[in-house]
Curated annotation (Swiss-Prot):
This is Alpha-crystallin B chain. It comes from Mus musculus. It is found in: Cytoplasm, Cytosol; Nucleus; Secreted; Lysosome. The modification N6-acetyllysine is found at K92, K166. Belongs to the small heat shock protein (HSP20) family. GO terms for cellular component: actin filament bundle; axon; cardiac myofibril; cell surface; contractile muscle fiber; cytosol; dendritic spine; extracellular region. Its main location: cytoplasm. Keywords: Acetylation, Chaperone, Cytoplasm, Eye lens protein, Lysosome, Metal-binding, Methylation, Nucleus, Phosphoprotein, Secreted, Zinc. GO terms for molecular function: amyloid-beta binding; metal ion binding; microtubule binding; protein homodimerization activity; protein-containing complex binding; structural constituent of eye lens; unfolded protein binding. Heteromer composed of three CRYAA and one CRYAB subunits. Aggregates with homologous proteins, including the small heat shock protein HSPB1, to form large heteromeric complexes. Inter-subunit bridging via zinc ions enhances stability, which is crucial as there is no protein turn over in the lens. Interacts with HSPBAP1. Interacts with TTN/titin. Interacts with TMEM109; in the cellular response to DNA damage. Interacts with DES; binds rapidly during early stages of DES filament assembly and a reduced binding seen in the later stages. Zn(2+) 2 binds at H104, E106. Residues 145-175 are annotated as: Disordered.
Amino acid sequence: MDIAIHHPWIRRPFFPFHSPSRLFDQFFGEHLLESDLFSTATSLSPFYLRPPSFLRAPSWIDTGLSEMRLEKDRFSVNLDVKHFSPEELKVKVLGDVIEVHGKHEERQDEHGFISREFHRKYRIPADVDPLTITSSLSSDGVLTVNGPRKQVSGPERTIPITREEKPAVAAAPKK
């Protein structure tokens, strides 16, 4: 009996860079793309290659994810919380951790009833004073938590290099 063997590199020549289907990466309560539900193109041809994720993936704001940035002068976290009102969100600083919590009770939307809750924690960098951290909510549902970074004190100086005549590593004794 003959058994057909399908080699994965024929279908996905860039296997390490191939991302899994977004179907399993979705957040509950969010929409799916039509391409996530119907894989007709992949079943019609063994040579069909799905576009790389960086070409087809939406930005972080459309996926419900967060973005943490550490810039030269500030630390910031941007978090998509468009499904929550300001009263349903809490931002706390506990030691060197920022904790963001959002919760809304069950309510009806166009697909039925849904309730949501999330907890996110972010470590505050050592050069950010926890007392200076602020948060704001934009009109499009992006929560921004940020704080200024402490500036490095003292001016920059060049350290001269001296040359020594002896080796840094002593020679091993000969046998």
